[in-house]
């Protein structure tokens, strides 16, 4: 039977990871390993200064005192006699589109699976008052089945964003590119109860490139967005231009 490792960045008790695990378990052998707390925005960070501790929960899930990347790395290296076939990360509570992908622990967990040589998918539910995790789980199962039948390149993952809509209101699936946001808003300056100055991150920037073909556009119009992401961040088209002046230094 196909073996799937499920992880996330919202934490092992988040509703999204349960919805995803339960849906996939109807068709595949599933192991669920996630952080013991919310690690949203953790990106690809690893825990290097402390040991990782694990705790097996009553439902069979395994919590880890680390980041999403830690969870996937640990699970693949230590919890399987034979590696899983696919890594699926999610279902994230909120969008991972455009620039968000660089900060996302959800995307990072999938990337770690890819770094270790496995096909991987990150899936997120987009909207306010999130409640349609079943819709995202349904599409996760469909996309996993498609990935099994039609593998993608070894340096890529699929980043999936699903509108927060009932299943019968989804218009279809679109293969997209990443959109882009304007610069993030400023910090929020406050005082703690002792009168000391503290800062919170402000809201993300508004959508700058949400044109047709982007993930932003697809989701805003009721479509599931599937964006292939590459692990290699090299801007190949810039190499000749930069090489010209670098070699003159």
UniProtKB/Swiss-Prot annotation:
Catalytic reaction annotation: a ribonucleoside 5'-phosphate + H2O = a ribonucleoside + phosphate
Concerning its family, UniProt says: Belongs to the SurE nucleotidase family.
Subcellular location(s) per record: Cytoplasm
Please tell me whether the keyword Hydrolase is annotated for this protein: yes
User: What is the required cofactor set for this protein?
Assistant: a divalent metal cation
Q: What gene does the UniProt entry assign to this protein?
A: surE
- Co-factor note (free text): Binds 1 divalent metal cation per subunit.
Its GO CC terms are: cytoplasm
E.C. designation(s): 3.1.3.5
Q: What is this protein called?
A: 5'-nucleotidase SurE
Question: Which Pfam family is one of those matched by this entry?
Answer: SurE
């Amino acid at each position: 039977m196909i073996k799937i490792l499920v992880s996330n960045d919202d934490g092992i008790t988040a509703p999204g990871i349960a919805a995803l695990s339960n849906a996939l378990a109807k068709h595949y052998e599933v192991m669920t390993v996630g952080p013991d707390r919310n690690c949203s925005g953790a990106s690809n960070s690893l825990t290097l200064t402390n040991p990782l501790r694990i705790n097996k929960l009553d439902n069979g899930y395994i919590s880890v005192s680390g980041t999403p990347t830690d969870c996937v790395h640990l699970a693949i290296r230590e919890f399987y006699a034979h590696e899983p076939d696919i890594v699926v990360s999610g279902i994230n509570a909120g969008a991972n589109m455009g620039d968000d992908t660089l900060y996302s622990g959800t995307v990072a967990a999938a990337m770690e699976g890819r770094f270790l040589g496995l096909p991987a998918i990150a899936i997120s539910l987009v909207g306010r008052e999130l409640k349609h995790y079943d819709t995202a789980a349904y599409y996760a199962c469909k996309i996993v089945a498609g990935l099994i039948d039609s593998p993608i390149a070894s340096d890529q993952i699929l980043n999936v964003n699903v509108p927060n809509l009932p299943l019968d209101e989804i218009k279809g699936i679109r293969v997209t590119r990443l959109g882009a946001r304007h610069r993030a808003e400023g910090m929020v300056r406050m005082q703690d109860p002792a009168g000391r100055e503290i800062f919170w991150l402000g809201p993300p920037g508004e959508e700058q490139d949400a044109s047709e073909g982007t993930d932003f556009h697809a989701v805003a119009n009721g479509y599931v967005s599937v964006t292939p992401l590459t692990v290699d961040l090299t801007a190949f088209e810039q190499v000749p231009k930069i090489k010209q002046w670098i070699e003159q230094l």
